[in-house]
Amino acid sequence: MSALAIANAAYVAAALLFIMSLAGLSKHETGRTGVRYGIAGMAIAIAATVWLSLSGEWSDSTYLGIGLLVAALIVGAVIGLWRAKVVAMTGMPELIALFHSFVGLTAVLVGWNGALHAKELSPDLAAVHSAEVFIGVFIGAITFTGSIVAYLKLSAKMSSKPLILPGRNFLNLFALIGFVVLTVAYVITPELGLLIAVTVLALALGWHLVASIGGGDMPVVVSMLNSYSGWAAAATGFLLSNNLLIVTGALVGSSGAYLSYIMCRAMNRS
């Protein structure tokens, strides 16, 4: 059995564990079990990814890549454990918002990497690849700045008052129209300037979307950003041809959106 087949089988097992984790987290009685399923699924996913990276042909760049991978795992694990231990339960929403910003930033970086180091593809596949890059960068950039603003508001490092700009809804609408126009242009002619433009546009839109919402509604915003981070992860999965990222991203995106809907109804918000 090839390394890719083993990794794909591990990804399927991890995806099933993530689904079981969501099911467990839906009830207070099974919450701890759900967390354990999630930990097990993530451990399997990381192990499969490391195994896949070690199974290829070895060269000088392979050693460098493995060194960076190990360093990232160690640094990320240490920081994650430290933050999880020192944060109080009342500070959990701001910590989650900060985590979402990392997911968004990752989607932006992966999208840019996919654009700068694109393989030779047929015209049809190249158009699909360009659309994946553009959409992934757009969603990721919105998630990144939106999550940063949510973190700053929840941690009282930024005023919780909503930012009211003249015609703010029209600004958001024009930004979305601009995204559609830029996407079509980039699919036709994938130029670096268009990618820079959509990145700046999405960063500004993410900041404005969350800054214009008051601090009292931040729990709903964090839930919505959770959904955005899921779709950003799914877009990253399409770029990397990683089925696990696509499945888990869709799970997080859909569950986050539904949770936001429930919270809006409970808080009498539109």
Protein language model regions, located:
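Structural signature of hydrophobic alpha-helical transmembrane segments
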Residues: 2-16, 60-76, 129-144, 187-201
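Membrane-interfacial segments at transmembrane helix termini in multi-pass membrane proteins
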Residues: 251-270
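Transmembrane alpha-helix boundary signature
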Residues: 49-66, 70, 81-91, 108-124
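Transmembrane helix-loop junctions at the membrane interface of multipass transporters and ion channels
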Residues: 57, 113-124, 188-193, 220, ...
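Mid-bilayer segments of alpha-helical transmembrane spans in multi-pass integral membrane proteins
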Residues: 77-82, 101-116, 133-149, 262
